[in-house]
Amino acid sequence: MSLIIGYIILLACAFGLAAGLYFGLSAIKLI
C-alpha cells in the first residue's frame, strides 16, 4: 500500500516537473 502511494507521488512530481519545464520553454520562446 505504501509503495503505491510512493509511486503516485513520484509520478505526480515527474509530471509537475515536465509541465514546469514545458511552460518554462514556452515562456522563453515568447520573449
Swiss-Prot record:
Keyword Methyltransferase attributed: no
Protein family per UniProt: Belongs to the PetL family.
Protein name, UniProt field: Cytochrome b6-f complex subunit 6
Function: Component of the cytochrome b6-f complex, which mediates electron transfer between photosystem II (PSII) and photosystem I (PSI), cyclic electron flow around PSI, and state transitions. PetL is important for photoautotrophic growth as well as for electron transfer efficiency and stability of the cytochrome b6-f complex.
The entry's keywords: Chloroplast, Electron transport, Membrane, Photosynthesis, Plastid, Thylakoid, Transmembrane, Transmembrane helix, Transport
Keyword Nucleotide-binding: no
Bilayer disposition of the protein: Single-pass membrane protein
Cellular component per GO, a single term: cytochrome b6f complex
Short name of one Pfam family: PetL
Transmembrane segments: 3-23
GO molecular function annotations of the record: electron transporter, transferring electrons within cytochrome b6/f complex of photosystem II activity
GO biological process: photosynthesis
Cellular localization per UniProt: Plastid, Chloroplast thylakoid membrane
Highest rank taxon of the organism: Eukaryota
Subunit note: The 4 large subunits of the cytochrome b6-f complex are cytochrome b6, subunit IV (17 kDa polypeptide, PetD), cytochrome f and the Rieske protein, while the 4 small subunits are PetG, PetL, PetM and PetN. The complex functions as a dimer.
